[in-house]
Every structure is written in structure tokens, then in C-alpha cells.
From Swiss-Prot:
Protein name as it appears in the record: Umecyanin
Domain Phytocyanin: 1-103
Keywords: Copper, Disulfide bond, Electron transport, Glycoprotein, Hydroxylation, Metal-binding, Transport
Entry keyword annotation includes Disulfide bond: yes
Origin species: Armoracia rusticana (Horseradish)
Amino acid sequence: EDYDVGGDMEWKRPSDPKFYITWATGKTFRVGDELEFDFAAGMHDVAVVTKDAFDNCKKENPISHMTTPPVKIMLNTTGPQYYICTVGDHCRVGQKLSINVVGAGGAGGGATPGA
């Protein structure tokens, strides 16, 4: 499945610091899914970071850093994944996303496929 991060709001500085937490709630991210971060070039970016960098909005030495929209990230490993915007105070005001990726056939929240 392909996910447009933030839906209609896309990837930008949110007015609600919990916006991206709320957006991700209830979604099951699986290996093989793709995240797409849409944003205005030069206004935002996407950095893949560690949990410590995510929790503390550390911008230095990200795992990877993409600045040209749209940024498409294929989910190819299970476990937690962390993304932030490194521009200004954007991460500190909530422009950050953490997800947990499950295996392609893994159960996500007990939902039955096709139910």
C-alpha cells in the first residue's frame, strides 16, 4: 500500500503537535508499503533518524536525508522507523513521524484481511 504522509495536509509544520501521531494511528505499515512525503521544495525535508534523534529532534548525522520532493521511501525492514523535518523548529513543533513496520504477512492489530 502507498501512504501519502499527512494526507491532505502533506508534510509540513503542523498546527497541532500531535498531527502526525494521529495520522499514523490505526494504520498498519507493512514491508513493501511506500511512504510518500509531499512538501514545498526548500521549505521542508525528510531525514531518516534514530529513536534518540527523533525523541530529541537531533538534526546531525541522520541515517539519510532527502531534500527534493516528493520523497518516496519503500518500507523494506520490520520494526520502528523514524522521520523528521530538519528545517528550523519544525521537528520540535511536531513535524516528525514514527511508525512500526510489520512483515508483509504479519498481523497488524488483529484485523482480519477482507473483513
